[in-house]
Amino acid sequence: MSNKKIIFFTGGGTGGHIFPGISIIQKLKELDNEIEFFWIGKKNSIEEKLIKEQNNIKFISIPCGKLRRYFSFQNFTDFFKVIFGIIKSFYILKKYKPQIVYATGGFVSTPTIIASSLLKIKRITHEMDLDPGLATKINSKFANKIYISFKESEKYFKNHKNIIHTGSPIRKEFLTPNPKIIKQLTQNTNKPIVSILGGSLGANALNNLALCIKKDAEIYFIHQSGKNLNDLREDNYIRRQFFNAEEMASIVKFSNIIISRAGAGAIKEFANACTCTILIPFKKGSRGDQIKNAKLLKTQNACIYIDEDEILNANILKIIKETLKDKEKINTLKANIKKFNNKNSSALIAQLLIKDIKETKSK
């Protein structure tokens, strides 16, 4: 092992696989400024974009293929991409000799976890969702430790000896949201604020919903659309392709209602803010992870759940207006989603990683 303190993170595909890792790195920097950080991901990807916006995290790309549960001719070509990804990861890790490899999810993480296993480097895989994805299921076969965001996820890893319920880290900006930001975004409106958030990649179904309901003059709408729509401001509506972390923290905390997908990272941020939330989980083309996340909250009366197929029939504007008038319902939803809060997750994980580094270097 190197005399330096080095941790490699790997993961990507969506913000939900990247922001938690960034949060952990931010906390580690506060506790130990001698640690060097690297992130292995896919070239020209969302992880490359987000990591290169950070200070003191070096990004390295590897070839990677998508892991599929179904038959596709791409499985053959992607198989070789995975192999090349393992080989490149092997030589990268051999060169830098990190003490820990930390996988945050997504198929890009699997080659690096396998390579770190071959090199006997301590490796951790973190499942952010309730239901583990295929990448995490594979990673868990090679990992020394599995971190889970939901206690209920333990049942999926019955044969693994080292499972730790750490929660899912949230971005530091969400711990101290600034109320002035949402006032600036909404031009100091006195109207109730409803925010429609499509996530880091946007969401066509939510974009279409926003375009249908934004004309209601009684509500101020904030809309994160992703790159498929241009930025726009109207009398009671603001649309941005992306909001930065400080803006998003203010939006989540001070909106009257949030309409969102049901990624685990977003749910944890809503829980931290005690947000009244309408969840419309991604359904088409997904493995069902968001549906399980949302249904878990629904069973705890912690959100309003709407099936993606029912968006057009659900009369969401009516649901919004009825909810805004029902203070008791709002208070119940806020109190119940708060139970999923784990704002100390970054600190817990950072302390565990520092302990692992010390144990590794003492050998």
Curated annotation (Swiss-Prot):
Q: Classify the main location.
A: membrane
> Cellular component per GO?
plasma membrane
User: What topology does the record note for this protein and the membrane?
Assistant: Peripheral membrane protein
What InterPro entries does the database record attribute to this sequence? GlcNAc_MurG, Glyco_trans_28_C, GlycoTrans_28_N
Query: What EC number(s) does its UniProt record assign?
Result: 2.4.1.227
UniProt-listed GO biological process terms? carbohydrate metabolic process; cell division; cell wall organization; lipid glycosylation; peptidoglycan biosynthetic process; regulation of cell shape
What name is this protein filed under? UDP-N-acetylglucosamine--N-acetylmuramyl-(pentapeptide) pyrophosphoryl-undecaprenol N-acetylglucosamine transferase
Protein species of origin: Borreliella afzelii (strain PKo) (Borrelia afzelii)
